[in-house]
Amino acid sequence: MAFLCETLERRVIPNWRSLSDTISNGELEYPQLENHVAFDLMEYEQEWSNNHSLLYASELVNAAVANGINDNSTAKNAAEYIVTCEGKTTDAQKSVAMSLLGSHNNEVILKSPHEIDELLMNTKDIYAKIGYYKSLIRKYPFNPINYVEAARFYVMIGQSRQAIEMMDIALALDSENRFVSRSAARLFVHVEDLDRAHYVLRKNEQVAFDPWLIASEISVNLLRDRSSSLIKNGIALINSGDFSPFSLTELTSSLGTLEFIKGTQKKSKLFFNKSLISPNDNSLAQAEWAKSNKLTLNFDREVCNKVNLSYEANALYAYQDNRFEDALKASIRWLNDMPYSKNPVFVGANIAYTFLKDYKTAAKILQRGLEANPNEPAFLNNLAYTYALDGKLIEANEIIHRINKVSEIGEKTRICLTATRGLIAYREKKIEEGRALYLEAIKAANNIADDPTYNWNAILNFIREEILATNIIPSDVETVLSQIHETPKDKGVKTLKQDILKLIAKGRTASFY
């Protein structure tokens, strides 16, 4: 049985992308914040003056943009040089340069969807990127951006310790930088150090005056089950008239989420609708999440369709609309955009194995997820489940053996793992063993009072395997199915019921063996 993705919670945690993508998304626009100490560009200016090359121009421009320095004439001169180097610059270099010159088009032209065969991470390329940023670090040891970029590539291949080491240096160099603070917070959320994620945000002296930082602080506190002391500051910024709707989108979204959790739907809708005036990909995905939890919101689809990098929101929207092929394509793009994140793996794989019965694609998505999260027990369980459904029992057992080496496994994942072992036993014609394991999983899942979907999924998987293995349709099966009252959100439960009803309609006269 797969660990369920339909019950996943979502918060407005900052998305961690490259500096150039963050700039393209408009998330580094800086108003004149109080007490802001300007970053010193002197070293970069001197290097550029002495060496008129693309490398030194890019370093100067990156440092200026990342620190909100938009009026430095030397940096603008370097940006103009980059733009004139047609055919020699990368898209990222040109994008950052144009943003400094004020001619950057904030509309990102999305690349075509990645083919699934390209999904598996090329670790050789990742190591090359790490090597590139380490060479820049040797040249510019006081530029925090290069450490942040290196950390992001480290975390893509599951090397969290090295990523944290890099991020610690970046924070030591410039803990006041929005890009550094938000990237660090996302990293520490990824490694489940929520207190550290909160600390780096609060340590930034601009947090009380910067809507992007307040949004992140409120959202991290929601993950910690704590109340934020900056809520009043955030509301004051919203009411000040000093910020554009886009600059406030994550803040209003995080406040909308807070009110939704408290049960004050009227306030929640007010904040969420403000976040949708000019959303980014994060606030749009949060609104889709709220809508899936029965909150009625004012979506302007013309506005939504123009949001840059909105793969997650597109996946959630298509999923709720039962357009599962579109949802899978968007999930794959979401995963390639943020390969360290767990949610696109859960969502994409679930769509593939539950609704499309595309087990090979599901397996590739889960394998990709395990590159960045090698010891995630839910990924391992879901991969074993996928292999078993696809008849690859040797591979399924190899994954089960790998799970046995994982020390920390949550209660819900253990229930899923017991059921998955039952599935494998059934497919190996060990019917009594499979039956016993499923009944054990059903009994354990029945104790999860706040989420009956685990119990329902265990029962439905059990019924399916009984019918497939024995060619016998239990006389009370339709009564059991009628007692499972799934909500519209429980799409996986509904699909499993439909799969069983199809078996019943066929009379189940043919075995899968």
Name each model feature, range by range:
Residues L251, G256, F260-L270, K274, ...:
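Core solenoid repeat modules with strong leucine/isoleucine-rich periodicity
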Residues A64-A66, L120, Y154, F188, ...:
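Residue at a conserved register position within TPR or TPR-like alpha-solenoid repeats
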